[in-house]
Protein backbone atom coordinates (compact mmCIF):
# COMPACT_ATOMS: atom_id res chain seq x y z
CA UNK A 1 0.00 0.00 0.00
CA UNK A 2 2.82 2.37 0.94
CA UNK A 3 4.51 1.55 -2.36
CA UNK A 4 1.37 2.50 -4.27
CA UNK A 5 1.05 5.81 -2.39
CA UNK A 6 4.71 6.61 -3.05
CA UNK A 7 4.26 5.92 -6.74
CA UNK A 8 1.22 8.21 -6.88
CA UNK A 9 3.17 11.04 -5.21
CA UNK A 10 6.01 10.64 -7.71
CA UNK A 11 3.56 10.77 -10.64
CA UNK A 12 1.87 13.88 -9.24
CA UNK A 13 5.19 15.67 -8.78
CA UNK A 14 6.24 14.65 -12.29
CA UNK A 15 3.00 15.98 -13.76
CA UNK A 16 3.39 19.25 -11.86
CA UNK A 17 6.95 19.63 -13.10
CA UNK A 18 5.82 18.81 -16.68
CA UNK A 19 3.01 21.38 -16.56
CA UNK A 20 5.37 24.04 -15.22
CA UNK A 21 7.83 23.27 -18.01
CA UNK A 22 5.07 23.46 -20.63
CA UNK A 23 3.87 26.81 -19.27
CA UNK A 24 7.42 28.14 -19.07
CA UNK A 25 8.15 26.95 -22.63
CA UNK A 26 4.95 28.54 -23.88
CA UNK A 27 5.77 31.85 -22.21
CA UNK A 28 9.33 31.72 -23.54
CA UNK A 29 8.02 30.88 -27.00
CA UNK A 30 5.59 33.80 -26.89
CA UNK A 31 8.35 36.14 -25.77
CA UNK A 32 10.60 34.79 -28.51
CA UNK A 33 7.83 35.17 -31.09
CA UNK A 34 7.19 38.75 -30.02
CA UNK A 35 10.90 39.46 -30.10
CA UNK A 36 11.20 37.82 -33.54
CA UNK A 37 8.33 39.95 -34.87
CA UNK A 38 9.97 43.07 -33.45
CA UNK A 39 13.30 42.07 -34.95
CA UNK A 40 11.55 41.29 -38.28
CA UNK A 41 9.86 44.67 -38.39
CA UNK A 42 13.09 46.40 -37.44
CA UNK A 43 14.91 44.47 -40.17
CA UNK A 44 12.26 45.32 -42.76
CA UNK A 45 12.47 49.02 -42.10
CA UNK A 46 9.82 51.54 -43.14
CA UNK A 47 6.58 50.27 -44.59
CA UNK A 48 6.24 51.32 -48.22
CA UNK A 49 3.32 53.40 -49.47
CA UNK A 50 1.49 51.96 -52.50
CA UNK A 51 2.31 53.73 -55.77
CA UNK A 52 -0.29 55.28 -58.00
CA UNK A 53 -0.15 53.90 -61.52
CA UNK A 54 0.95 56.50 -64.03
CA UNK A 55 -1.66 58.11 -66.20
CA UNK A 56 -1.89 56.45 -69.65
CA UNK A 57 0.13 58.22 -72.30
CA UNK A 58 -1.37 60.91 -74.54
CA UNK A 59 0.44 63.42 -76.70
CA UNK A 60 0.14 67.20 -76.40
CA UNK A 61 -3.07 67.23 -78.45
CA UNK A 62 -4.73 64.52 -76.36
CA UNK A 63 -4.20 61.96 -79.13
CA UNK A 64 -4.04 58.34 -78.07
CA UNK A 65 -0.72 56.73 -78.81
CA UNK A 66 -0.29 53.36 -80.53
CA UNK A 67 1.13 50.20 -79.00
CA UNK A 68 2.01 47.17 -81.11
CA UNK A 69 2.08 43.84 -79.25
CA UNK A 70 3.41 40.66 -80.80
CA UNK A 71 6.38 38.47 -81.60
CA UNK A 72 9.31 38.84 -84.02
CA UNK A 73 6.97 39.95 -86.82
CA UNK A 74 6.16 43.05 -84.76
CA UNK A 75 9.70 43.34 -83.42
CA UNK A 76 11.05 43.42 -86.98
CA UNK A 77 13.38 40.44 -87.15
CA UNK A 78 14.98 40.43 -90.62
CA UNK A 79 14.90 44.18 -91.23
CA UNK A 80 17.85 45.24 -93.37
CA UNK A 81 19.14 47.85 -95.82
CA UNK A 82 16.45 49.01 -98.26
CA UNK A 83 15.60 51.96 -100.54
CA UNK A 84 12.43 52.74 -102.48
CA UNK A 85 11.54 55.22 -105.21
CA UNK A 86 8.98 57.88 -104.27
CA UNK A 87 7.63 60.99 -106.07
CA UNK A 88 10.07 62.97 -103.92
CA UNK A 89 13.05 60.82 -104.84
CA UNK A 90 14.81 57.85 -103.27
CA UNK A 91 13.66 57.07 -99.74
CA UNK A 92 15.87 55.20 -97.28
CA UNK A 93 13.76 52.61 -95.42
CA UNK A 94 16.71 50.65 -94.06
CA UNK A 95 15.84 48.72 -90.90
CA UNK A 96 12.23 49.87 -90.96
CA UNK A 97 9.77 47.82 -88.95
CA UNK A 98 5.99 47.86 -89.28
CA UNK A 99 5.52 49.92 -86.07
CA UNK A 100 8.12 52.47 -87.20
CA UNK A 101 6.47 52.73 -90.62
CA UNK A 102 3.08 53.21 -88.96
CA UNK A 103 4.47 55.97 -86.74
CA UNK A 104 5.96 57.75 -89.74
CA UNK A 105 2.72 57.58 -91.73
CA UNK A 106 0.38 58.59 -88.89
CA UNK A 107 2.61 61.03 -87.05
CA UNK A 108 1.50 59.31 -83.83
CA UNK A 109 4.03 57.92 -81.34
CA UNK A 110 4.01 54.16 -81.87
CA UNK A 111 5.55 51.66 -79.46
CA UNK A 112 7.10 48.40 -80.59
CA UNK A 113 6.40 45.80 -77.91
CA UNK A 114 7.35 42.84 -80.08
CA UNK A 115 9.38 40.05 -78.46
CA UNK A 116 10.99 37.48 -80.75
CA UNK A 117 9.82 33.91 -80.20
CA UNK A 118 6.94 34.91 -77.93
CA UNK A 119 3.97 32.55 -77.84
CA UNK A 120 0.43 33.92 -77.85
CA UNK A 121 -0.17 33.30 -74.14
CA UNK A 122 3.07 35.13 -73.30
CA UNK A 123 2.08 38.11 -75.43
CA UNK A 124 -1.31 38.24 -73.75
CA UNK A 125 0.37 38.22 -70.32
CA UNK A 126 2.75 41.04 -71.27
CA UNK A 127 -0.11 43.10 -72.71
CA UNK A 128 -2.12 42.71 -69.50
CA UNK A 129 -4.72 40.26 -70.81
CA UNK A 130 -4.09 36.90 -69.16
CA UNK A 131 -3.57 37.69 -65.47
CA UNK A 132 -0.80 36.26 -63.30
CA UNK A 133 -0.93 35.92 -59.51
CA UNK A 134 1.54 35.42 -56.67
CA UNK A 135 1.46 31.89 -55.24
CA UNK A 136 2.16 32.69 -51.57
CA UNK A 137 2.15 35.35 -48.84
CA UNK A 138 5.46 37.23 -48.88
CA UNK A 139 7.16 40.22 -47.33
CA UNK A 140 9.25 42.05 -49.91
CA UNK A 141 11.68 44.94 -49.59
CA UNK A 142 13.68 47.25 -51.83
CA UNK A 143 17.08 45.84 -50.88
CA UNK A 144 17.02 42.07 -51.28
CA UNK A 145 14.88 39.98 -53.62
CA UNK A 146 12.39 37.41 -52.34
CA UNK A 147 11.56 34.22 -54.23
CA UNK A 148 8.00 33.66 -55.37
CA UNK A 149 6.23 31.82 -58.18
CA UNK A 150 3.79 33.43 -60.60
CA UNK A 151 0.74 31.34 -61.47
CA UNK A 152 -2.17 31.60 -63.88
CA UNK A 153 -5.83 31.43 -62.95
CA UNK A 154 -5.65 27.63 -62.71
CA UNK A 155 -2.65 27.67 -60.38
CA UNK A 156 -0.15 26.59 -63.03
CA UNK A 157 3.30 28.08 -62.61
CA UNK A 158 4.30 30.34 -65.52
CA UNK A 159 7.90 30.50 -66.65
CA UNK A 160 8.95 33.15 -69.23
CA UNK A 161 12.29 34.58 -70.33
CA UNK A 162 11.03 38.04 -69.44
CA UNK A 163 7.70 39.26 -68.15
CA UNK A 164 7.75 43.02 -68.23
CA UNK A 165 6.45 43.73 -71.75
CA UNK A 166 8.58 46.56 -73.12
CA UNK A 167 10.38 44.40 -75.67
CA UNK A 168 13.11 46.42 -77.36
CA UNK A 169 11.65 49.80 -76.41
CA UNK A 170 13.85 52.12 -74.36
CA UNK A 171 12.73 52.07 -70.75
CA UNK A 172 14.33 53.51 -67.63
CA UNK A 173 12.36 51.16 -65.35
CA UNK A 174 13.18 47.64 -66.60
CA UNK A 175 11.36 44.60 -65.21
CA UNK A 176 8.74 46.84 -63.57
CA UNK A 177 5.29 45.63 -62.44
CA UNK A 178 2.42 46.72 -60.26
CA UNK A 179 1.38 44.30 -57.51
CA UNK A 180 -1.37 45.50 -55.15
CA UNK A 181 -0.45 49.04 -56.10
CA UNK A 182 3.23 48.57 -55.29
CA UNK A 183 5.77 49.13 -58.04
CA UNK A 184 7.99 46.04 -58.02
CA UNK A 185 10.67 44.39 -60.12
CA UNK A 186 10.47 40.78 -61.24
CA UNK A 187 13.41 38.88 -62.69
CA UNK A 188 13.52 35.24 -63.82
CA UNK A 189 15.73 32.74 -62.00
CA UNK A 190 17.79 30.56 -64.32
CA UNK A 191 16.54 26.97 -64.53
CA UNK A 192 13.71 27.64 -62.06
CA UNK A 193 9.96 28.25 -62.20
CA UNK A 194 10.28 30.91 -59.50
CA UNK A 195 11.22 34.57 -59.87
CA UNK A 196 13.01 37.20 -57.81
CA UNK A 197 10.60 39.84 -56.50
CA UNK A 198 11.40 43.08 -54.72
CA UNK A 199 10.10 46.60 -54.31
CA UNK A 200 11.27 49.03 -56.96
CA UNK A 201 13.91 51.30 -55.47
CA UNK A 202 13.10 54.86 -56.45
CA UNK A 203 16.13 57.07 -57.19
CA UNK A 204 17.16 58.94 -54.06
CA UNK A 205 15.35 56.54 -51.73
CA UNK A 206 17.26 55.99 -48.49
CA UNK A 207 16.91 53.09 -46.12
CA UNK A 208 14.97 49.88 -46.41
CA UNK A 209 11.29 49.79 -47.27
CA UNK A 210 9.02 46.77 -47.16
CA UNK A 211 5.53 45.66 -48.13
CA UNK A 212 3.35 42.63 -47.52
CA UNK A 213 2.11 40.91 -50.67
CA UNK A 214 -0.65 38.37 -49.97
CA UNK A 215 -1.15 35.23 -51.96
CA UNK A 216 -3.20 35.58 -55.18
CA UNK A 217 -2.20 39.22 -55.70
CA UNK A 218 -2.56 40.28 -59.35
CA UNK A 219 0.63 41.04 -61.26
CA UNK A 220 0.34 43.76 -63.94
CA UNK A 221 3.26 44.59 -66.25
CA UNK A 222 4.04 48.31 -66.11
CA UNK A 223 3.98 48.51 -69.91
CA UNK A 224 0.40 47.20 -69.94
CA UNK A 225 -0.68 49.64 -67.23
CA UNK A 226 1.02 52.63 -68.85
CA UNK A 227 -0.42 51.90 -72.30
CA UNK A 228 -3.89 50.74 -71.34
CA UNK A 229 -5.55 53.56 -73.31
CA UNK A 230 -3.48 53.20 -76.49
CA UNK A 231 -4.79 52.19 -79.89
CA UNK A 232 -3.70 48.56 -79.97
CA UNK A 233 -2.15 46.58 -82.83
CA UNK A 234 -2.24 42.89 -81.86
CA UNK A 235 -0.53 40.06 -83.72
CA UNK A 236 0.11 36.66 -82.16
CA UNK A 237 -0.10 32.93 -82.65
CA UNK A 238 2.76 32.18 -85.04
CA UNK A 239 4.85 30.65 -82.23
CA UNK A 240 2.04 28.61 -80.70
CA UNK A 241 0.70 29.11 -77.19
CA UNK A 242 -2.90 28.28 -78.20
CA UNK A 243 -2.80 24.54 -78.94
CA UNK A 244 -3.92 25.19 -82.54
CA UNK A 245 -7.39 25.87 -81.12
CA UNK A 246 -8.83 29.02 -82.69
CA UNK A 247 -11.22 29.55 -79.77
CA UNK A 248 -8.29 29.67 -77.33
CA UNK A 249 -6.45 32.19 -79.50
CA UNK A 250 -9.56 34.35 -79.83
CA UNK A 251 -10.01 34.24 -76.04
CA UNK A 252 -6.41 35.44 -75.60
CA UNK A 253 -7.05 38.37 -77.93
CA UNK A 254 -10.28 39.18 -76.11
CA UNK A 255 -8.55 39.07 -72.72
CA UNK A 256 -6.37 42.01 -73.80
CA UNK A 257 -9.18 43.97 -75.43
CA UNK A 258 -11.60 43.50 -72.54
CA UNK A 259 -9.03 44.11 -69.78
CA UNK A 260 -8.27 47.54 -71.27
CA UNK A 261 -11.86 48.19 -72.40
CA UNK A 262 -10.31 48.94 -75.78
CA UNK A 263 -12.53 49.91 -78.70
CA UNK A 264 -9.73 51.00 -81.05
CA UNK A 265 -7.69 47.99 -82.08
CA UNK A 266 -6.51 46.05 -85.12
CA UNK A 267 -6.09 42.26 -85.22
CA UNK A 268 -3.29 41.35 -87.63
CA UNK A 269 -3.56 38.11 -89.58
CA UNK A 270 -0.59 35.73 -89.74
CA UNK A 271 1.69 36.15 -92.76
CA UNK A 272 3.22 32.69 -92.95
CA UNK A 273 2.49 30.96 -96.23
CA UNK A 274 -0.48 28.54 -96.08
CA UNK A 275 0.41 25.31 -94.32
CA UNK A 276 3.79 26.52 -93.00
CA UNK A 277 2.92 28.16 -89.68
CA UNK A 278 4.40 26.48 -86.61
CA UNK A 279 1.42 27.64 -84.58
CA UNK A 280 -1.40 26.22 -86.72
CA UNK A 281 -1.41 22.50 -87.49
CA UNK A 282 -4.94 22.62 -88.93
CA UNK A 283 -4.17 24.33 -92.23
CA UNK A 284 -2.69 22.50 -95.22
CA UNK A 285 -1.04 24.07 -98.27
CA UNK A 286 -4.27 23.48 -100.20
CA UNK A 287 -7.99 23.53 -99.49
CA UNK A 288 -9.93 20.34 -98.81
CA UNK A 289 -10.83 20.12 -102.51
CA UNK A 290 -7.16 20.28 -103.51
CA UNK A 291 -7.27 23.86 -104.77
CA UNK A 292 -4.71 26.44 -103.72
CA UNK A 293 -5.63 29.04 -101.08
CA UNK A 294 -4.56 31.98 -103.25
CA UNK A 295 -6.19 35.16 -101.96
CA UNK A 296 -8.95 33.23 -100.22
CA UNK A 297 -9.04 32.85 -96.45
CA UNK A 298 -7.29 30.10 -94.55
CA UNK A 299 -9.18 28.51 -91.64
CA UNK A 300 -7.18 30.66 -89.22
CA UNK A 301 -7.97 33.83 -91.13
CA UNK A 302 -11.66 32.93 -91.29
CA UNK A 303 -11.79 32.33 -87.53
CA UNK A 304 -10.28 35.74 -86.74
CA UNK A 305 -12.36 37.52 -89.38
CA UNK A 306 -15.57 36.01 -88.00
CA UNK A 307 -14.60 36.92 -84.43
CA UNK A 308 -13.39 40.49 -84.97
CA UNK A 309 -15.05 41.64 -88.20
CA UNK A 310 -13.68 44.88 -89.62
CA UNK A 311 -11.03 45.07 -86.88
CA UNK A 312 -9.25 42.16 -88.59
CA UNK A 313 -6.79 42.76 -91.40
CA UNK A 314 -5.84 39.79 -93.57
CA UNK A 315 -2.22 40.84 -93.80
CA UNK A 316 -1.19 37.87 -95.93
CA UNK A 317 -3.68 38.86 -98.62
CA UNK A 318 -2.73 42.53 -98.31
CA UNK A 319 0.91 41.60 -98.92
CA UNK A 320 -0.07 39.45 -101.90
CA UNK A 321 -2.11 42.19 -103.52
CA UNK A 322 -0.15 45.31 -102.54
CA UNK A 323 3.24 44.47 -101.08
CA UNK A 324 5.29 44.56 -104.27
CA UNK A 325 3.60 47.69 -105.58
CA UNK A 326 4.07 49.48 -102.23
CA UNK A 327 7.82 49.02 -102.64
CA UNK A 328 8.01 49.66 -106.39
CA UNK A 329 8.84 46.07 -107.31
CA UNK A 330 7.82 44.32 -110.52
CA UNK A 331 6.15 40.93 -110.19
CA UNK A 332 8.34 38.11 -111.52
CA UNK A 333 7.12 34.88 -113.06
CA UNK A 334 7.88 33.12 -109.78
CA UNK A 335 5.87 35.77 -107.95
CA UNK A 336 2.89 35.06 -110.22
CA UNK A 337 3.07 31.34 -109.50
CA UNK A 338 3.40 32.01 -105.77
CA UNK A 339 0.48 34.44 -105.87
CA UNK A 340 -1.82 31.70 -107.17
CA UNK A 341 -0.72 29.50 -104.26
CA UNK A 342 -1.21 32.27 -101.69
CA UNK A 343 2.55 32.60 -101.10
CA UNK A 344 4.02 36.05 -100.43
CA UNK A 345 6.83 37.15 -102.77
CA UNK A 346 10.36 36.30 -101.66
CA UNK A 347 11.29 39.87 -102.62
CA UNK A 348 9.56 40.92 -99.39
CA UNK A 349 11.08 38.25 -97.16
CA UNK A 350 14.35 37.77 -95.29
CA UNK A 351 13.66 34.05 -94.73
CA UNK A 352 10.74 31.63 -94.92
CA UNK A 353 8.71 33.47 -92.28
CA UNK A 354 10.14 36.96 -91.57
CA UNK A 355 10.00 40.02 -93.77
CA UNK A 356 12.87 42.24 -94.83
CA UNK A 357 12.52 46.02 -94.54
CA UNK A 358 10.56 46.11 -97.82
CA UNK A 359 8.07 43.66 -96.36
CA UNK A 360 7.79 45.50 -93.05
CA UNK A 361 7.33 48.81 -94.87
CA UNK A 362 4.44 47.36 -96.88
CA UNK A 363 2.98 45.78 -93.74
CA UNK A 364 3.15 49.12 -91.93
CA UNK A 365 1.37 50.79 -94.84
CA UNK A 366 -1.34 48.13 -94.67
CA UNK A 367 -1.84 48.88 -90.96
CA UNK A 368 -1.97 52.59 -91.73
CA UNK A 369 -4.67 52.13 -94.38
CA UNK A 370 -6.66 49.85 -92.06
CA UNK A 371 -6.59 52.53 -89.37
CA UNK A 372 -7.82 55.11 -91.88
CA UNK A 373 -10.67 52.76 -92.80
CA UNK A 374 -11.60 52.41 -89.11
CA UNK A 375 -11.32 56.15 -88.44
CA UNK A 376 -8.39 55.92 -86.02
CA UNK A 377 -6.31 58.50 -87.92
CA UNK A 378 -6.41 60.40 -91.19
Place the predicted regions along the sequence by residue:
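N-terminal Sec-pathway targeting helices
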Residues: 1-7
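Alpha-helical cap/lid subdomain in secreted, periplasmic
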Residues: 2, 20, 24, 57, ...
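Hydrophobic alpha-helical membrane-insertion segments, chiefly the h-region
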Residues: 7-20
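N-terminal, intrinsically disordered, polar/charged segments of Gram-positive cell-envelope systems
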Residues: 23-64
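Catalytic nucleophile-elbow at a beta strand-turn-alpha helix junction centered on a G-D-S/GDSL motif
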Residues: 64-92, 116-120
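Conserved beta-strand scaffold positions in the cores of enzyme catalytic domains, especially
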Residues: 110-112, 312
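Residue-level recognition of beta-strand->loop/alpha-helix junctions
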Residues: 112-115, 269
Amino acid sequence: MLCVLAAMVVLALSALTFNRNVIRDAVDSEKQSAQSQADWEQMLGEEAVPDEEEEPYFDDDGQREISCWGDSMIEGDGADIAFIETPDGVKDISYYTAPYTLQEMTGIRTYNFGVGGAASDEISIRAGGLVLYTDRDVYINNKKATRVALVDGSGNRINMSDYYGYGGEDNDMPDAFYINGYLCTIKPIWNSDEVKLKLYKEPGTKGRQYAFIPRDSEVTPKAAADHSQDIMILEMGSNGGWQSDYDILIMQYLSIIQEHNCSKYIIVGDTDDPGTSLGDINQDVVNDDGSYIGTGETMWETALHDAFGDHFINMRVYMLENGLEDCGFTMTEQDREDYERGIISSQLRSDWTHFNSYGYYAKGKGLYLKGVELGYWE
